[in-house]
Amino acid sequence: MFGKLTFDAIPYHEPIIMITYIAIILIALCIASTITYYKKWKYLWYEWFTTVDHKKISIMYGILAFVMLFRGFVDAILMRTQQVVASAGFKGFLPPHHYDQIFTAHGVIMIFFVAMPLVIGLMNLVIPLQIGARDVAFPFLNNLSFWLNVSSAVLLTLSLGIGEFAQTGWLAYPPLSGIKYSSGVGVDYWIWSLQISGVGTTLTGINFLVTILKMRAPGMSFFKMPVFTWTSLCTNILIVISFPVLTVTLVLLTLDRYFNFHFFTNDLGGNAMMYVNLIWIWGHPEVYILVLPVFGVFSEVVATFSKKRLFGYVSLVWATLSITILSFIVWLHHFFTMGAGADVNTFFGITTMIIAIPTGVKIFNWLFTIYQGRVHMHSSILWTLGFLVTFSIGGMTGVLLSVPPADFVLHNSLFLVAHFHNVIIGGVVFGCFAGINYWFPKLFGFVLNEIWGKRAFWFWIIGFFLAFIPLYFLGLMGMTRRLSQNIDSEFHMLLCIAAIGACFIGIGIICQVIQFFISIKERRHNLDLTGDPWDGRTLEWSTSSPAPLYNFAIIPKVEDRDDFWRNKEGQHYNKLINSINYHDIHMPKNTGLGFMISIFSLFFGFSAVWHITWLCILSFLAIIISLFINSLNEDTEYTISAEEIKKIEHQYWKNIQKAGLK
């Protein structure tokens, strides 16, 4: 009845796993008890779980990212500590099979459940506001996409205490991920977590792509769009093209494991290297899916806090488009050692070097924007400056790895690990932190505490260099990835320095938690009354903070690239107050079907992992029926009256006048 699921699936003999899992259960029970005690379930259901408001969904993506960041960071600390202990001549506290699970989970969590939610959360908040829209094109899909990501994160977490996770590395290369060498459920957990999350991300890509193409404010041509919107457009083009490749690749691996097909086996016509090509055809665009939106963040931040128009806007746009195209023809640099031949390696090495050119163009544009600007050293600018240094180092080492002979020496070493952490942490994570500090008041109506924000930055940047620069040297010394036992003692000192760096990053995370708590506590002293705390340039700053449900009482008409900045000259606000005629606004209704479909998806994924056929069929049918019911629903909107809008907007204008703005 329960397929392969038995009580033996619970790892009673692993004290670290059991203690961790019990702690997770206790924390979940405490949260549920607190919500019950304060009678907040109804509030959460109607205001959050069922919401289709892009701003609230953005907040929920951020919560998911920070919860999973804690899990991923703990995994990183465990791995680094194990390596330090093992390099000192001891066995350590993590057996190889447990270390390999942590190693795999760390990569999956940080890419799919930290970086992606942070990036998608920022796009959710900013895109509709920047283009003058009231919401995204498909509000229900937005809700569904989020909850699919949550269900896949829960499925991954279940593997910690029920069964095991994959021991293959985060990309699960065959034949190791095949049924012959990984006969347990670990790879199946990996497959279905990524599959459900990937479907949600694909729906997000379609949603944002249509939103940008079809819902821009009147007059906002492509070359009047803010750079963040441009980078988001290119990102979602990449999502729509590349994520179906991941979906198909996972389907083929599933057929190999479940039905004894031979797509990626070493016999009967299979080809394991086809999998490696397919996974990286998705995997390298994924790097730019993560990094392009934060390029947009930095573009907005440097222009705002330098009090200047962005230098080289057109070149930035073309550089973004160039990266979008080139990102599909560089994937083979991840496996020069495969043996494709000198000509193939040379081609992909050259394309990899070429893609560094538009990235370099962007960096110079940001530097020239800052040059001779009246720079306000806000924490967002600090994260940007930190990015410029760390990402440049990561980019240079990436160009070095694009040379096939050098890659043959450095492939699979810690040099490579240092490189991609330079890019992902120094680029994506720093960029998301800059964006959070920058756009936070637009969500919550008050600014974040700058003192603790800057402390967090300095601990992060110092910890980052201590944690990852030693890895370059370890890679050059010959230390490979995935080592957990019998590590050469000559690596011990540098591993200790890297571990100290990880502790500094941990302190940085604690500073960020303190920053949020202090900001909430002192919010009455840091209110953003005008909706424009940074003297911004783009449309999101033309509405109140927090932005109202409808975003804009009147859809703006755009005449210039920095239209809001230009309009603020003279008597802009007074003109608006005297000229607005309000009308009823139709907004999308909340729906609980997205949440329900995610529950059914969780049951489907769990039953597929454990071969519980009846539950798998029932949950799949429930998903189809739920989607069918949603398609029949015609009562999808409600009306906000003109009187209510007028009341909200007049309060905003009073705040504007109190601030002395004209």
UniProtKB/Swiss-Prot annotation:
InterPro entries: Cyt_c_oxase-like_su1_dom, Cyt_c_oxase-like_su1_sf, Cyt_C_Oxase_1, Cyt_c_Oxase_su1_BS, Cyt_c_ubiqinol_oxidase_su1. A ubiquinone binds at residues 71, 75, 98. It is a multi-pass membrane protein. It catalyses: 2 a ubiquinol + O2 + n H(+)(in) = 2 a ubiquinone + 2 H2O + n H(+)(out). Its cofactor is Cu(2+); heme b; Fe(II)-heme o. It is found in: Cell membrane. GO terms for cellular component: plasma membrane. One of its GO terms (molecular function) is oxidoreductase activity, acting on diphenols and related substances as donors, oxygen as acceptor. GO terms for biological process: aerobic respiration; electron transport coupled proton transport; respiratory electron transport chain. Its EC number is 7.1.1.3. The chain crosses the membrane at residues 15-35, 59-79, 107-127, 146-166, 190-210, 233-253, 278-298, 310-330, 347-367, 381-401, 414-434, 457-477, 494-514, 587-607, 609-629. Binds 1 copper B ion per subunit. Residues 1-14, 80-106, 167-189, 254-277, 331-346, 402-413, 478-493, 608 are extracellular. There is a cross-link at residues 284-288 (1'-histidyl-3'-tyrosine (His-Tyr)). SUPFAM superfamilies: Cytochrome c oxidase subunit I-like. Gene3D superfamilies: Cytochrome c oxidase-like, subunit I domain. Cytochrome bo(3) ubiquinol oxidase is the terminal enzyme in the aerobic respiratory chain. Catalyzes the four-electron reduction of O2 to water, using a ubiquinol as a membrane soluble electron donor for molecular oxygen reduction. Has proton pump activity across the membrane in addition to electron transfer, pumping 2 protons/electron and generating a proton motive force. All the redox centers of this enzyme complex are located within the largest subunit, subunit I. Protons are probably pumped via D- and K- channels found in this subunit. Ubiquinol oxidase catalyzes the terminal step in the electron transport chain. Belongs to the heme-copper respiratory oxidase family. The cytochrome bo(3) ubiquinol oxidase complex is a heterooctamer of two A chains, two B chains, two C chains and two D chains. This is Cytochrome bo(3) ubiquinol oxidase subunit 1. It comes from Buchnera aphidicola subsp. Acyrthosiphon pisum (strain APS) (Acyrthosiphon pisum symbiotic bacterium). The lineage of its organism: Bacteria, Pseudomonadati, Pseudomonadota, Gammaproteobacteria, Enterobacterales.
